[in-house]
Regions:
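Short strand->helix junction
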Residues: 44-45, 78, 117
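STAS-typified acidic loop motif
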Residues: 26-52
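Short, solvent-exposed amphipathic alpha-helical segments in soluble enzyme
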Residues: 55-56, 128-130, 201-203
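N-terminal short beta-loop-beta anion/metal-coordinating cradle
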Residues: 14-32
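Amphipathic alpha-helical segments at domain termini/boundaries
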Residues: 1-15, 152, 157-238
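Conserved catalytic cores of soluble enzyme domains
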Residues: 81-188, 195
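A structural preference for short, pocket-lining loop segments at secondary-structure junctions
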Residues: 34-40, 54-82
Length: 238
């Protein structure tokens, strides 16, 4: 689905969302009449420092705002230009992610919706930083592609390709990401999205459950147990 189709299905009665220069911003009415803030990246646009600080600013603009946030993502990776790197790209991306963490901690639901491509730091700082991540069929997320992993780890690409067949954490793609627990659910584009969004918002926020989801789905069998053990040891040490 394209962003125009998604917005039409989310807000059948109309919305105040605009898409300019790859940036999505505005708001739309939920089925109960309240409003949801809509932000994001469109058209496979790379996420640079100007975009990251602008998105964070939209989230932080009004400290009294309690609208939930929907982050629509169809991006390239982060913009790895000289200017962005020299000005501290990683800090800008971290600031955007932490803006969402803050919103979630203050009672604003943050929902990431993957509908196109996204990769690397752009993915981590936007949709993956949301409290809940959902997707539409055809989304193409990748934290790092296998050739890049090969360059970093010095492992042969053939070896990584074999590992990816059995270990979802090594493999890009929506199905693998869902197996690890990162994606809560994949929405059905044949049904109105406004109802699926309403159902999600009706569920109480349950904190970060990605490790337990990954264990249940077989994509990350150890993460939940290790996290629990670390927690128990920390408590024991006072």
């Amino acid at each position: 689905m394209k962003h125009a189709e998604i917005l039409a299905s989310l807000f059948a009665a109309g919305h105040e969302v605009t898409v300019e220069g790859g940036r999505i911003h505005g708001q739309g009415p939920l089925k109960d009449g309240s409003m949801i803030q809509v932000l994001g990246v469109a058209d496979d646009t790379p996420l640079g420092i100007d975009d990251a600080i602008w998105l964070a600013g939209q989230i932080l603009a009004d400290p009294t705002d309690r609208r939930p946030i929907l982050m629509l993502i169809d991006s390239d990776s982060q913009r790895m230009a000289r200017r962005d790197e020299l000005l501290g790209l990683s800090e800008y991306l971290a600031h955007l992610a932490k803006a969402q963490f803050l919103a979630e901690s203050e009672g604003r639901r943050t929902i990431g919706l993957l509908y196109g491509h996204t990769a690397a730091g752009a993915f981590i700082a936007t949709a993956l930083a949301a409290g809940t991540l959902v997707a539409l069929p055809g989304a193409r997320p990748e934290v790092m592609d296998l050739p890049s992993i090969s360059r970093v780890t010095k492992l042969p690409l053939d070896t990584l390709q074999e590992m990816a067949k059995a270990t979802p954490v090594f493999a890009p793609g929506l199905e693998n990401l869902a197996q690890t627990g990162a994606v809560l659910t994949v929405w059905d584009p044949a049904k109105p999205l406004d109802g699926q969004l309403a159902e999600l918002l009706a569920e109480p926020a349950s904190g970060d459950q990605r490790d337990t989801l990954g264990k249940a789905r077989g994509g990350r069998p150890k993460a939940a147990d290790i996290a629990q053990r670390v927690f128990e040891l920390a408590q024991a040490d006072g």
